[in-house]
Amino acid sequence: LVIIVRHAERASEPATDPALTPAGERRAEALATALADARIGTILTTTYRRTRDTARPLATRLGIEPQAVAVRSGGPDTHIQDVVAAVRRASGNVLVVGHSNTVTAIVAALGGPAWPPLCDTSFGQAFAVQPNGAQTAVLRLRYGEPDAAPGAGCL
């Protein structure tokens, strides 16, 4: 089972690598509570602070060291391929903490449906993907406080 989420709410400064806002910290705790019994064996993040901070409460609770999948040159497609390769090497159920432009693309790369990217205001969606040969089951779930209504062309 692979659970894919976007990082929690982030501050606007510093622009290059912001921390989570207080709302984001609460959402990260809500994620840890929601997944406490999900038998997560591997946590994958990017090298960006907001993804690591989102994963931290669950990682601490489970005693797991998150693995950062670097965002290399080559754009999002290269990163998505790297994440999928890391998922396939992982042990146990996997949590992937990504970004608005990668979450649904990772779902699709694992065999799920092609959805538009997440909206800038979408932080509380989780996608549970169960690859199973030719059949891939996907559940779209919500956790934490409700998000703002999505805009056009995004989830």
Q: Can you describe what each PLM-predicted range is?
A:
Residues 97-99:
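Short beta-strand segments
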Residues 93-95:
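Acidic/histidine-rich alpha-helical segments that form the ligand environment
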Residues 1-91, 103-127, 131-155:
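Active-site-proximal alpha-helix that buttresses catalytic centers in soluble enzyme cores
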